[in-house]
Structure formats: C-alpha cells, structure tokens
Amino acid sequence: MTHYPKITPETPFDAVIVANGAFPKHETLLRILHHAPHVIACDGAAKTLLDAGFTAQQMTVIGDGDSLAPRLKRQLHFISISEQDDNDLTKATRYVCTQHGPAQPQLTANRRLRIAYLGATGKREDHTLGNIALMMHCYDHFNVQPFMLTDEGIFIAACGDCRFDLTPGQQVSLFNFGCQQLESQGLRWPIYPFDALWQGTLNEAVQPIIQIKADNAYLVYITWTFY
C-alpha cells in the first residue's frame, strides 16, 4: 500500500515545475519552491519567477520561447523545444525525466520521481483542465509521482491501494480514471467506481488516515489545512 504523508514545507521533491498560471501566494508553497533542488520554468513563468526574486541561475527554462523577449532568453538557461504536439508542462516533465535517467538506478517502479507542479491552475480555464488531466498522463507514462499544488489544495495522482495522512475535516474529492473497484475507509461518504468525474467530489475526511482500495488509477484532491 502506497503511503502519502502530509505535504509540508520540508517535503522533499526531486524537482519543482512552475507553469505560467496563477503564481502561488501562500508561504508553504513558496517555501517548497525555494527549497527545490531543481526549478524548471515553463516558458513565460520564467519572468514571473524573476519578478518574485529568483535569479536566472536558479532555474532552467523549457519551451518554445514565444512568450519571452530575446534579451531575457539570453540571460536564462533556456532550452528551446519548438514542437507543438505537447504543451510546456509535458516538455518540462520530460526534461526532468532525462535528468534523472539510467545514471540514477535508485529510481525504479517503487521510487518514482517526485515532481511538484506550481502555477498550473488559474488564468485560462482550458489550460487548468488540461494541466490537471496531464497529471494522470505523467503518472502513467513518465514514471513520476506528480503533485499539483495550488493555494487552495493539492492534486495527487495515485493507483491501487493507498493511504493518505489527513486532518479530520479536510475536504477530499476523488476522480476515477479506470477503476472497476473503488472503496474507502475514513471518508464521510463511501466511494464506488464513479463513471462521471463530478460524482466523487466534495467528500470529507473523518479520520486522520484515509485508505483507498482500488484496482486502477485515480486522482485525489485534498484541501489544505493552513487556512
């Protein structure tokens, strides 16, 4: 059973990818960003990071460069990827995977790359929906464990039997991505193999640990407790 402890400012991530959506405001998320061993900015997010006090040397920038001025690109560690089949978030994820490849054998099926995604929601709604859905694609195809962090909560891609450390009263939503078996312990309302995305929303933890029993993949959303 996979265990997901609570996310704190000290939670370790292999990399933090910053998209060009709503930049985080809460101190917990900003501390996670500042503690990151590797920060990757998706194209225009580089300017946001610079405005927030980061230096060009603290980040790698991935994208086609269409939203960055030439002068700014020359200052940055900019990796141009011009193909349009994937969005910048996918390109950044693939780049992180290439940096943690065969030379690091400790990364196996039991040790996925832990990537935190910031700035992936807000602004345009179509980008938000696409980025949230992309978490499952990253989990399935890149052998990463994605965590999408926003000022309101966190999305976690998961599969199979898992347990999550929570605080009773935290709001929980669960989105089914192929489960024929889907059960829970520790939630106010029982879950089942939902066939529509809205059906698993607006649940609540009633115990400090919730357990999910499943036979396939699902996406969990958990609200923060720091408000």
Where are these regions (language model features)?
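Anionic-ligand-binding alpha/beta catalytic cores of soluble enzymes and soluble regulatory domains
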Residues: R112-C162
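Structural motif
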Residues: A19-A22, A120-T121, T223-W224
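Short phosphate-binding loop-to-helix
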Residues: L76-L107
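A generic secondary-structure signal
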Residues: T48-A52, Y95-Q99, H137
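N-terminal beta-strand-loop-alpha-helix module at the start
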Residues: M1-K73
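Short glycine/serine/threonine-rich phosphate/pyrophosphate-binding segments
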Residues: K25-E27, T48, D88-T90, R124-L129
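Long, charged alpha-helical interface segments
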Residues: D151, A158-Y227
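Solvent-exposed alpha-helices and their adjacent loops that cap or buttress functional pockets
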Residues: K6-T11, L30-H34, F54, L72, ...
